[in-house]
């Protein structure tokens, strides 16, 4: 994980500049928010990056956002854009906020964790989700690890098998509402 953090520290500006703003994630975010009552619209955004476009969309949809990212450079960008929200430099693997959220989003972040760390995240998700809260995360289609090249530097990705994700979710009190 330190390599991923270092990657984003070194490339925050370039990644933010190149990150699409067209919000291809909108369908998933709308499905996440639809059943959540207005008073529960406090979203924990794990691996929030620079806040674009996910946090912006959540904020514009009336959510309060608490964003967590291991990269201080990314958090600085989020805080500059959305100073009324809460932004913290923390490692999601050791998160202990003593707060529960109506929704947790880990979009394009969770898959940067090693497989053993992904397994260990499910109790952390459970500890931070409100009753009837919803969890949205991205993963790969099958168990495996990959190191891609971005900006001439290696960037780690991993995924468990979808069946293992379903088992981990069930063991931690989650029900799969949609998988695609």
Stretches with model-predicted labels:
Residues 119-131:
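A short glycine-rich, Lys/Arg-flanked "PGG" loop and its adjoining helix->strand segment in the class I
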Residues 148-164:
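Acceptor-substrate binding/catalytic loop of class I
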Residues 1-38, 143:
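Conserved class I S-adenosyl-L-methionine
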Residues 105-106:
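A conserved beta-strand element that flanks and buttresses the S-adenosyl-L-methionine
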Residues 174-180:
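Conserved S-adenosyl-L-methionine
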Residues 44-46, 50-94:
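Class I SAM-dependent methyltransferase SAM/SAH-binding core
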């Amino acid at each position: 994980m330190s390599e991923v953090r270092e990657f984003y520290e070194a490339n925050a500006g370039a990644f933010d500049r190149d990150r699409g703003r067209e919000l291809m994630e909108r369908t998933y975010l709308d499905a996440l928010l639809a059943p959540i009552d207005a008073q529960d619209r406090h979203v924990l955004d794990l691996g929030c990056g620079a806040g674009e476009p996910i946090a912006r969309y959540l904020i514009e949809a009336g959510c309060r956002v608490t964003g967590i990212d291991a990269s201080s450079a990314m958090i600085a960008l989020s805080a500059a854009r959305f100073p009324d929200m809460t932004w913290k430099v923390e490692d999601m693997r050791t998160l202990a906020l003593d707060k529960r959220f109506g929704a947790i989003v880990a979009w394009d972040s969770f898959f940067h964790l090693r497989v053993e760390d992904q397994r260990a995240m499910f109790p952390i998700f459970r500890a931070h989700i409100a009753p009837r809260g919803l969890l949205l995360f991205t993963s790969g289609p099958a168990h495996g690890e990959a190191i891609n090249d971005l900006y001439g530097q290696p960037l780690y990705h991993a995924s468990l098998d979808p069946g293992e994700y379903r088992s981990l979710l069930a063991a931690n009190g989650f029900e799969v509402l949609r998988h695609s």
